[in-house]
Curated annotation (Swiss-Prot):
Localization: Plastid, Chloroplast thylakoid membrane
One term of GO molecular function: oxidoreductase activity
Residue spans crossing the bilayer: 36-56, 95-115, 131-151
Assembly and oligomerization: The 4 large subunits of the cytochrome b6-f complex are cytochrome b6, subunit IV (17 kDa polypeptide, petD), cytochrome f and the Rieske protein, while the 4 small subunits are petG, petL, petM and petN. The complex functions as a dimer.
Designated name of the protein: Cytochrome b6-f complex subunit 4
Family recorded in the similarity comment: Belongs to the cytochrome b family. PetD subfamily.
Length: 160
């Protein structure tokens, strides 16, 4: 057990800090040496032990052996590249496709400047940023799912 310091609520300085919403870390158990020397190494060693144990108990093959004479009909990238792959696949002009791919990080960089993020951290008080995030998430999922389908069904996801 560590040393637990109870707050003195009669202290006017602490009362002023608590009234402003500050001072919540003014008391409690210290991080040094309790957390840094005892808890963190146990968690890190436990994580390493779990990974090694799973690797020993259930070794898995990396994949099929490569066959240079058997090429799949359609080569798909890794799952995290599906939305970008779908953009390049559906846009007929490749320069426009590259510009659309560049516009994604550019748009993400402009989101903090649309609203004053430092003022509020609650997403319900930042409706523009929240709406852009939700629309971007839906579009990324739509493009990602569409990339796994044939090109004829990819834009409508086979629904229409």
């Amino acid at each position: 057990m560590g040393v637990t310091k109870k707050p003195d609520l009669n202290d006017p300085v602490l009362r002023a800090k608590l009234a402003k919403g500050m001072g919540h870390n003014y008391y409690g158990e210290p991080a040094w040496p309790n957390d840094l020397l005892y808890i963190f190494p146990v968690v890190i060693l436990g994580t390493i032990a779990c990974n090694v144990g799973l690797a020993v108990l259930e070794p898995s093959m990396i994949g099929e052996p490569a066959d240079p004479f058997a090429t799949p009909l359609e080569i798909l990238p890794e799952w995290y590249f599906f939305p970008v792959f779908q953009i390049l696949r559906t846009v007929p002009n490749k320069l426009l496709g590259v510009l659309l791919m560049v516009s994604v990080p550019t748009g993400l960089l402009t989101v903090p400047f649309l609203e004053n993020v430092n003022k509020f951290q609650n997403p319900f008080r930042r409706p523009v940023a929240t709406t852009i995030f939700l629309i971007g998430t839906v579009v990324a999922l739509w493009l990602g799912i569409g990339a796994t389908l044939p090109i004829e069904k990819s834009l409508t996801l086979g629904l229409f």
